[in-house]
Amino acid sequence: MDNENPAHAGWRLARENPKLVLLEVAWRWSFGILALLLLGWAVASVLHRVTISDADWVALRSLDLHDTPYTLAKIIILFWQDLLLVFATLLSALALAWMITATWGRAATLRILEGRSNTPAVAGLNLLRVLLFIVTLLAAVFAVEGAVWLSTPSAADPAELNWALYLLIVLIALPLIMIAWGILNWVLSLAPLFAVREQKGAFASLAAAFRSLRCNRKVYWSVSGVYGLYRGAALVALTVMGLLLAVLSQSKIVLGLLLALLLLYFAFADLLYVARLAAYLQIVEGQLPALQLPAAS
């Protein structure tokens, strides 16, 4: 297996270690269940704090292109303080839940692959991912608000918004922000491999991840492309089967089948994630000596 490429090696390791997949499913689905419970709490809290009239309920349920957005905007404007408090609490709780489950899950999977772990460094890297998400969210909000400000000729009359300029700014700024977030988040997800192998802290592991990407970017992109293609094909298959089932019938049985297909897709996506992680580990193991910084003389 010396000539085995990283993508094939990762797939083989995932198949030979079903416990890896079970651990990945366990932590991701645990977070998913916690997220649903927290979302349910947020909805209940909003309904308790916000008074919605019968007419507003009718407008919200109608899904009318004019009445529904108008009613929703009116509710947000009237109760923005309560909604902001609930949103901030929900976001904080989700971040904490994700940090705990993700740190436990990644430390456990790497312990199987490497025989050891580095939980403090993994937790630090996950904290950086949470902070990156918050910064990205704020950047998106500022981009939208900045687009409104730049597209309004007169501050006294916001109705004079230049929609063409507004859309141009938003459609350029938001994709750039998302691309930057995607790249940095991916590097942060790669860094735990170096935290475990080199037993270093979060920032040293992050620096090692950047060095590895600089030396082996083609191999990393190749592995990511292979598993991205698999996941894309699975998503297309899920969409096609879901549409076919929806066209054939709208019974509860079909709804149950759709839910089962969705869960199957999530499980397959977790399998692919573990295989990709193992493939990245093969790259790291093959290049580790070249990544060490020279000792200071």
Predicted regions and their residues:
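Juxtamembrane transition segments at transmembrane-helix termini in multipass membrane proteins
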Residues: 2-9, 15, 19, 23-78, ...
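Hydrophobic alpha-helical transmembrane segments of integral membrane proteins
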Residues: 101-103, 107-142, 211-230
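Cytosolic-side membrane-entry/anchor segment at the start of a transmembrane helix
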Residues: 13, 17-29, 34-41, 114-144
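Alpha-helical membrane-spanning segments of integral membrane proteins, especially the hydrophobic core
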Residues: 79-95, 115-141, 162-177
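Non-cytosolic segments of integral membrane proteins
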Residues: 139-160
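Hydrophobic alpha-helical transmembrane segments of membrane proteins
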Residues: 93-104, 108, 270, 274
